[in-house]
UniProtKB/Swiss-Prot annotation:
One BP annotation, GO: threonine biosynthetic process
EC number: 2.7.1.39
Record-given protein name: Homoserine kinase
Pfam families: APH
Gene name as annotated: thrB
Length: 305
């Protein structure tokens, strides 16, 4: 999370007039993350997370917010959205789409244990199953068409080796996207910093703003690529096994899904290598921003062989 849009105390008081959350106390920017402006909001009724959306449009928000409400009602550990007095889940702040969600207990981790990987994998499978009857749709905005378009923009700023690697991987994936596999609503960004933990247990998944329809192996691979990734950008096989084991304890994988998983891992590497390259070479302006190392997923991709 980052802060690109600054919000004054007076703006916040006006915003809160649309909610039954008591009086404004304080607002603290959250520097972690890369896409939206995020704050911890404290009022006389409690603590919340405020998100001001820098890319998503107002009409797109109901999908994400209703999804969180749906999952919360199904027992999935998520940050439930807070409704306004008029019943809406989305709002406007500083001329941009915005929302409030519950502030969950727990914290993220940079060094997960096998137990934490196991329980996170299990909760991801529970999420996949719980969203099966969610009625709204969202296509994946950062899949193969986006990779291809972004690649063309990036080629002039990449080294010859990186450009060749990126182009060859995108070309290899274009006819192998896993569209034949079980699919549904996926988180699509379940990195370690998007999961709050309380000891070994999951207290909540957060930041669903890349959620969309996709194949479950792609979602699982994105998560494993981060949760089992070591400091030198290789995979810890014990953490990978624990994560997938937790997932399969809730939703067993077919032989076809298991066979596709290595390809899904490569697709996950491309998606985040590309997005980090864009953030690095074409950064957004903001007062508190956080750009992640784009080489992490290039190096992980190379380590996969």
């Amino acid at each position: 999370m980052s802060v690109y849009t600054s919000v004054s105390d007076d703006e916040m008081r006006g915003f809160l007039s649309g909610y039954d959350l008591g009086e404004f106390v304080s607002l603290q920017g959250i520097a972690q993350g890369i896409t939206n402006s995020n704050y911890f909001l404290t009022t006389t009724s409690g603590r919340y997370v405020l998100t001001v959306f820098e890319v998503l449009k107002q009409e797109e928000l109901p999908f994400f917010l209703e999804l969180n409400r749906h999952l919360s009602m199904k027992g999935v550990a998520v940050a439930a959205p807070v409704a306004r007095k008029d019943g809406r889940l989305d709002s406007v702040l500083a001329g941009k789409p915005a929302c409030l969600v519950a502030c969950l207990k727990g914290s993220d981790t940079a060094l997960p244990t096998a137990e934490q990987c196991f329980h996170t994998g299990a909760m991801l499978a529970k999420m996949h199953l719980a969203a099966a009857d969610f009625p709204l749709e969202m296509e994946n905005p950062r899949y193969n068409a986006w990779w291809t378009e972004a690649c063309a923009r990036l080629l002039p700023v990449l080294s010859q080796d990186d450009a060749a690697l990126l182009c060859s991987e995108i070309d290899a994936l274009k006819d192998n996207l896993g569209n034949h596999l079980p699919s549904g609503i996926i988180h699509a960004d379940l990195f370690k910093d998007n999961v709050l933990l309380d000891g070994g247990q999951v207290s909540g998944f957060i930041d669903f703003y890349y959620a969309c329809r996709g194949n479950f192996m792609y979602d699982l691979a994105i998560a494993v690529n981060d949760w089992a990734r070591t400091a030198d950008n290789k995979l810890d096989e014990a953490l990978k096994k624990a994560f997938i084991g937790g997932y399969e304890g809730v939703r067993p994988l077919s032989a076809e899904e298991k066979a596709y998983f290595p390809t899904a891992q490569r697709a996950g590497c491309i998606r985040f290598w590309v997005s980090r390259l864009l953030d690095f070479h074409f950064p957004q302006a903001g007062e508190m921003t956080f750009i992640k190392d784009p080489n992490a997923f290039r190096n992980l991709l190379l380590s996969l062989g």
